[in-house]
Amino acid sequence: MRVILAPMQGVLDPFVRELLTEVNDYDLCITEFVRVVDQLLPEKVFYRLCPELKNQGFTSSGTPVRVQLLGQHPKCLAENAIRAIDLGSHGIDLNCGCPSKTVNGSNGGAALLKQPELIYRATQALRRAVPSEFPVSVKVRLGWDDISQAFEIADAVEQGGATEITVHGRTKADGYRADRINWKKISEVRERLSIPVIANGEIWHWQDGQDCLSQTGCQDLMVGRGALNIPNLSHVLKSNAEKMPWYEIQKILQKYANVENEYDSGFYHVARIKQWLRYLNKEYNEANQVFDKIKTCQTAEDLKLRLNEK
């Protein structure tokens, strides 16, 4: 079984990827999306969103990283895919699942679910552009506002030449509602396709992973929010390990606060650690106490001081 760290825009940034892969055995990470509009992006854009490219596409602990592209123009997607591969990306992932209103309003992400033909053309363009030894993957949801086109969407991905597909078990309209998860439909998609299907959605603990594998018939899982709730989730899912103790999480947070970020405006780590603590609070009561301690922080220096307080 592979466990893949999902792309989460504005959450699973390079620094979080670095920290999570240090304490796990993730098989692959997907980056936050690189937005492609109508031109070939400069190298610095790829390096900013995927600094691992400067390390041959690996995190410092050796986990391969795959660049995700978001866009609607097949030709431009293909041109930027070639650049990402040349810089060291371990394949290319196409975003057809982001539910953000801003992204969808520009006809990107989940908006493509309404246009299976465009998914096909985009996937085909990527496959033709990317050398055959590099995988092309596509991340989708089950549909836009219902699951009636789930098979058509999946067929478009496979017929476009994708190596594998990740299926999030909800529609765009479902958002992240727990009661809307549909692993059964993922199973039906898997039975229909000949390429590997990676299951995604509502995988928080070891038992969730076992249930998802059983109900979908998939061999691989992708996790996002759960990886923030339990920082060693990959170990938990693969070997039923105990969740990481809080004192180890404190060390991770302190390390994150001390990472130098050349793109930081001064408030970056403050906002991100507050955000992470909200996820951790779902599994650790101590997260609330730490949040209360840092909630008035406005600078990185103040944050470091308070996190180091006993």
Swiss-Prot record:
Enzyme Commission number(s): 1.3.1.-
Domain of life: Bacteria
tRNA-binding among keywords: yes
Record keywords: Flavoprotein, FMN, NADP, Oxidoreductase, RNA-binding, tRNA processing, tRNA-binding
Catalytic reaction equation(s): 5,6-dihydrouridine(16) in tRNA + NADP(+) = uridine(16) in tRNA + NADPH + H(+); 5,6-dihydrouridine(16) in tRNA + NAD(+) = uridine(16) in tRNA + NADH + H(+)
Active site residues according to the UniProt entry: C98
The name this protein goes by in its record: tRNA-dihydrouridine(16) synthase
Organism listed in the record: Haemophilus influenzae (strain ATCC 51907 / DSM 11121 / KW20 / Rd)
Gene: dusC
